[in-house]
């Protein structure tokens, strides 16, 4: 295959089959690939991920995808870890004994793709169980086109222990002990902390909105939170 309209980036760190099924269920064709040329030529790019930022960035670099992803100009949608990898960096907690000095209690900062100027940090759950796993509501929703037909109070499915704080790039928020960014965006890059592919009809609406998105909509003035 030399081209595809819609692609899912294969970083080796995601349940790609469930994302592919969620897209195809809506009647869209989609290709899973780590081919740089196919990704660059696609009209829409979906960037899912699960697990640790360190492992995912290692895979991205091993596949020579870092510069290609940073250079994309078409709409890109990240899910969960995919959203977190769009930020400047992720703080993944204490270094393990296999990473050097056992007495080093400093946090491990993982440089990410630096597509959206915010950072990911441990979720301030204020005593709530981590990971934050299950259905939760969006507490605020901007007018970003990815949220067409989505309202404050709508439920989405989350699984995460890290989150991006509220910033000028927040386009939706959620609360779990503290308020965090449920979605962020800058230019052509959009990230959702929740899993659209696991969020029933409303999650399907997010995916459909993205795949039907006219890139000119991203250039319109948005009212962020």
From Swiss-Prot:
Cellular component terms per the entry's GO annotation: cytoplasm
Pathway linked to the protein: Amino-acid biosynthesis; L-histidine biosynthesis; L-histidine from 5-phospho-alpha-D-ribose 1-diphosphate: step 5/9
Enzyme Commission code: 4.3.2.10, 3.5.1.2
Glutamine amidotransferase type-1 domain segment(s): 5-220
Signal peptide residue numbers: none
BP GO terms, sorted: L-histidine biosynthetic process
Catalytic reactions on record: 5-[(5-phospho-1-deoxy-D-ribulos-1-ylimino)methylamino]-1-(5-phospho-beta-D-ribosyl)imidazole-4-carboxamide + L-glutamine = D-erythro-1-(imidazol-4-yl)glycerol 3-phosphate + 5-amino-1-(5-phospho-beta-D-ribosyl)imidazole-4-carboxamide + L-glutamate + H(+); L-glutamine + H2O = L-glutamate + NH4(+)
Coiled-coil segments on the chain, per record: none
Transmembrane segments: none
Domain of life (superkingdom): Bacteria
HAMAP family listed in its UniProt record: HisH
The name this protein goes by in its record: Imidazole glycerol phosphate synthase subunit HisH
Organism of this sequence: Colwellia psychrerythraea (strain 34H / ATCC BAA-681) (Vibrio psychroerythus)
């Amino acid at each position: 295959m030399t081209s595809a309209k819609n692609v899912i980036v294969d970083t080796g760190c995601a349940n790609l089959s469930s994302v592919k099924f969620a897209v195809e269920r809506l009647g869209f064709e989609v290709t899973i690939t780590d081919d740089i040329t196919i990704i660059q030529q696609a009209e829409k790019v979906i960037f899912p991920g699960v697990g640790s930022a360190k492992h995912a960035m290692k895979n991205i670099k091993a596949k020579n995808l870092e510069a290609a992803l940073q250079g994309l100009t078409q709409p890109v949608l990240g899910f969960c870890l995919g959203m977190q990898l769009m930020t400047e960096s992720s703080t993944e907690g204490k270094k393990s004994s296999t990473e050097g000095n056992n007495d080093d209690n400093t946090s491990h900062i993982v440089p990410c793709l630096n597509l959206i100027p915010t950072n990911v940090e441990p979720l301030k759950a204020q005593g709530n169980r981590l990971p934050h796993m299950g259905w939760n509501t969006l507490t605020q929703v901007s007018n970003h086109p990815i949220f067409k037909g989505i309202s404050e109070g709508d439920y989405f499915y989350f699984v995460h222990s890290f989150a991006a704080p509220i910033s000028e790039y927040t386009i939706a928020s959620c609360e779990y002990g503290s308020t965090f960014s449920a979605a962020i965006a800058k230019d052509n890059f959009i990230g959702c902390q929740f899993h659209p592919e696991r969020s029933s009809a409303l999650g399907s609406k997010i995916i459909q909105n993205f795949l039907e998105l006219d890139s000119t909509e991203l250039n319109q003035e948005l009212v962020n939170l």
